[in-house]
Amino acid sequence: MADNLNLVSVLGVLLVLTIFHNPIIVYAGEGVPNVALFTFGDSYYDAGNKVFLSQRKDLPQTYWPYGKSRDYPNGKFSDGHIVPDFIADFISIPNGVLPPVLKPGVDISRGVSFAVADASILGAPVESMTLNQQVVKFKNMKSNWNDSYIEKSLFMIYIGTEDYLNFTKANPNADASAQQAFVTNVINRLKNDIKLLYSLGASKFVVQLLAPLGCLPIVRQEYKTGNECYELLNDLAKQHNGKIGPMLNEFAKISTSPYGFQFTVFDFYNAVLRRIATGRSLNYRFFVTNTSCCGVGTHNAYGCGKGNVHSKLCEYQRSYFFFDGRHNTEKAQEEMAHLLYGADPDVVQPMTVRELIVYPTGETMREYWEPNNLAIRRRPSRDFYLGLAAYY
């Protein structure tokens, strides 16, 4: 009898592990309604707008080895597709890519990318646009889509890197109060831009938190930190990220419009840290996480794609987390898209993008964002790229 009970227990454990550790396969369009995707932000989401906005003819992202994994440079800062492309594919947008808004003649019926490299929340970026300018451009184009279609479509935002990189360069000795004041200024402007989008009919928001900026290869190289991250930038990113969830909670709770306010927060900061942390990166099959695949310098972080720079190129980009000094390889981008779309509640809350799409428009959210250090895991982690190591 004891042996039988032990056998049942073992089988039960195996069943649980099988359920929660089998890879989640996202089938494009499966059970997902027809919605559009609109993206706003900087080079991480730029689908090629910088190419059409800039007067320069030698932009590095238009030259090999950018686009290497897709056989051609496509104006994106990666060896292939970026996160919005994978999300577009998951929701069956034609060709599985999101077109840049500045490219003439593109089909914008299922959405478009307003993101531009070098974009910021504050200031006046050269040959780029602030987030507010991107939102105003959407406002001017709004008549291309029905109001009811806009209400159920996705609005993805990733921006802020330029603001904090520029602040750190200009204020290397800024004290805590100066840092806090700057973060507050950035967040207030971001809040106004999201409020403007909301007033234009957007109701489903996906906000991606900032990466650990101090761990970018270009930052390690410029600040000569070796294998360590530059903590001042990481601290600024953490301060910024900590204000996003409460801000979106407030929007959702005070919404009075008939279409409501619903959102998803992607904790990109911790998703990245998992993959670049010493001793854990191999669990995700990333063998090089502190230097770039393409570039020159101590961390191969500068000059990728520039004709006047004899940059190095790694032999196998899928073993690298970073493709250039600031941007991820297609492999890393795809992992992030899967996490965001339907996987890991540790880094995506209060719901995944897939859940957000099908959530009834106008319905009050049943769950809200919670700080990670206080949140109780509602479901086992589904970061299947980590496998058994996800249980820690």
Swiss-Prot record:
Location, primary (coarse class): secreted
Uppermost EC category:
hydrolase
- Which CDD domains does this UniProt record tie to the protein? SGNH_plant_lipase_like (cd01837)
Q: Does the keyword 4Fe-4S apply?
A: no
Instruction: Give the record's glycosylation annotations as residue positions.
Output: N146, N166, N290
The record lists the effect of A389S as: In strain: cv. Landsberg erecta
Keywords linked to the UniProt accession: Glycoprotein, Hydrolase, Lipid degradation, Lipid metabolism, Secreted, Signal
Q: List the signal peptide residues.
A: 1-28
Role according to the record? Represses or inhibits nitriles production from methionine-derived and from indol-3-ylmethyl glucosinolates. Favors isothiocyanate production.
Membership in a protein family: Belongs to the 'GDSL' lipolytic enzyme family.
Q: Quote additional remarks.
A: ESM1 is highly expressed in cv. Columbia while lowly expressed in cv. Landsberg erecta.
Write the protein's name.
GDSL esterase/lipase ESM1
Q: Which organism is it from?
A: Arabidopsis thaliana (Mouse-ear cress)
